[in-house]
Amino acid sequence: MSNETKQPEQGEEYLVPVERYMAAAVRLGARVSNNYLQERGFIFSVRPDGLRIFNLKRIDERIRIAARMITRYPPSRVMVHSTKPYAFKPIQMFCKFVGCLPVTGRLIPGTLTNPYLTHHIDIDLLMVADPKTDFQAINEASLTGIPVIALVDTDSDPTFIDLMIPCNNKGRNSLALVFWLLARQVLRERGELKPNEDLPVSWEEFRVPVGQSRS
């Protein structure tokens, strides 16, 4: 496949400079990929060490599409979830700015499906950081007809996912930048930020501190 450094076209406009995407390793995938993602143009190349490289243009496009999708729902009816510690702070910061419901850590079975439970949550849209670790929430959403947005790696299972955002969903830098971009783009779509206006905090503020578990 093509060399990974040749993808960005001169003058092409992205949500952030290409160098920032690369520095945060947003394009790095796993050493395994599935045909579903390959056929849809999400995977751009394979490095000599076997790591898949995501198509940067598709990442950028999907962040924009996801932001538009999120704005269709009342913020309080959108749940953002992950069991991955590296996603906790990005999710909490995203929800702080956007007004969505952050649910981090283990999801108690029945949270989305059993209205008789005291911990039941009634939502219209679910977003998760990793289909592999957040499968409980995805399965419950599928049973109740709740659409799902998910950050997907090259080896992620697309089952029950309505909108995929291809990206490195394991790294602390990548998760921070993607959720920062999503928050900024949602606020731009709502008109709460001007088209070229940034959040009042840098993307680094969305990042989990060094030393926190990544399991």
UniProtKB/Swiss-Prot annotation:
GO terms for molecular function: structural constituent of ribosome. Keywords: Ribonucleoprotein, Ribosomal protein. SUPFAM superfamilies: Ribosomal protein S2. GO terms for cellular component: small ribosomal subunit. Signal peptide: none annotated. It holds the Pfam family Ribosomal_S2. GO terms for biological process: translation. NCBIfam families: uS2_euk_arch (TIGR01012). Belongs to the universal ribosomal protein uS2 family. This is Small ribosomal subunit protein uS2.
